[in-house]
């Protein structure tokens, strides 16, 4: 915000602290509700009920933080257990269910140290033993990584990843970053011979109709053969339908190039949240509102794979990724994440 937006340094720091405070507020409200309810309902002498209440309030706070104001789900407590003894529960109850169990166990352990709750120590010990036993059972009996069926070889696709390393503050500057992007990616897309080529988000920083004469047609012709395909970040759309942050797929046999439009947009980067236009004016960045793609867009099919693109931080929203598996027959075999600095 300060380096690229010109916002006063003190205000930029204040904005970051305000965001951190807002995210912490969910848990503060959950803790306040826990104290109020345990006091009002007389649960102070019922550690098991109190632990379940705490876990429920904690989970509600995480659900709210993961969905309200565009959502910040990637800090959910369940993710901390991806390599821990509770990991096997994820396939049954999801990340929020794992977080609920962890919060309940943590509450029982904390309550077990309360001098007035002697029985809680026994309950906490039992809960810990149950958790360890369940973990051992899970490690012994559950395979968390899907294996190919007997006699079925996993599909292997050779991929070339392109990265032009165009500085972010120059990427959309006419005559410098734009020219560098078009030149470098144009040369690489023409020269590379890998079966599948993947470029980053907005690798081509112009709409197809804004590209130099013959540039887009040359790319379409280059990938009209049967042996190669490309996935490339390109802005698409028009004033009437709206502009989208998109990934196009080029391969033979298409009437129109494959298209994936980013669904989960970045607040202040790709859309302006309601009531915050004053903040955008203060940031001094010429932002506009992008149009959203739909949830569960089709995959790009190539060499037996169904490749599901997503853009930038979309890979943090598990529920939206899971929506692409609604139809098992069209479910992705792999995700392809592209961002403005990587893939």
Where are these regions (language model features)?
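Active-site catalytic loop in hydrolytic enzyme cores
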Residues: 2-18, 41, 66-93, 243-318, ...
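Generic detector of well-ordered alpha-helical packing
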Residues: 63, 67, 95, 202, ...
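Membrane-embedded alpha-helical bundles of multi-pass enzymes
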Residues: 1-144
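Asparagine-centered polar/low-complexity signal
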Residues: 106, 165, 245, 337-340
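Class I S-adenosylmethionine
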Residues: 131-136, 175-176, 336
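Soluble catalytic regions of membrane-associated enzymes that act on cell-envelope
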Residues: 139-271, 292, 297-315, 321-328
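Membrane-proximal, cysteine-centered motifs at transmembrane boundaries in secretory-pathway
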Residues: 317-320, 324, 331-334, 338-343
């Amino acid at each position: 915000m300060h380096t690229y937006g010109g916002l006063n340094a003190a205000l930029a720091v204040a904005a970051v602290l305000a965001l951190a405070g807002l995210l912490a507020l969910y848990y503060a409200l959950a803790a306040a509700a826990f104290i109020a309810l345990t006091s009002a309902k007389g649960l102070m002498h019922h550690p098991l009920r109190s632990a379940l209440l705490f876990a429920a309030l904690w989970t509600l706070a995480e659900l709210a933080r993961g969905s309200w104001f565009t959502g910040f789900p990637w800090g959910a407590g369940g993710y901390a257990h991806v390599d821990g003894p509770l990991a096997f529960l994820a396939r049954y109850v999801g990340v929020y269910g794992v977080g609920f169990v962890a919060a309940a166990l943590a509450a029982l352990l904390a309550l077990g140290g309360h001098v007035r709750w002697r029985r809680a120590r026994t309950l906490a010990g039992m809960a810990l033993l149950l958790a360890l036993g369940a973990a051992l059972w899970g490690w012994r009996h559950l395979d968390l990584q899907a294996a190919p069926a007997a006699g079925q070889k996993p599909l292997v696709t050779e991929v070339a990843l392109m990265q032009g390393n165009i500085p972010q503050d120059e990427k959309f500057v006419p005559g410098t970053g734009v020219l560098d992007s078009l030149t470098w990616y144009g040369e690489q897309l023409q020269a590379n011979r890998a079966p599948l080529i993947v470029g980053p988000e907005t690798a081509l920083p112009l709409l197809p109709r804004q590209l130099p004469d013959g540039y887009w047609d040359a790319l379409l012709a280059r990938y009209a053969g049967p042996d190669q395909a490309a996935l490339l970040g390109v802005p698409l759309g028009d004033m009437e339908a709206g502009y989208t942050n998109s990934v196009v797929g080029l391969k033979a046999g298409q009437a129109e190039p494959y298209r994936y439009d980013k669904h989960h947009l970045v607040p202040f980067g790709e859309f302006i949240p309601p009531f915050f236009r004053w903040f955008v004016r203060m940031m001094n960045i010429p932002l506009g509102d992008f149009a959203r793609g739909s949830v569960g867009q089709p995959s790009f099919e190539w060499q037996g794979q169904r490749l599901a693109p997503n853009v930038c931080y979309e890979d943090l929203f598990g529920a939206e990724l899971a929506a692409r598996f609604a139809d098992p027959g069209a479910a992705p075999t792999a995700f392809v994440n592209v961002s403005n600095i990587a893939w």
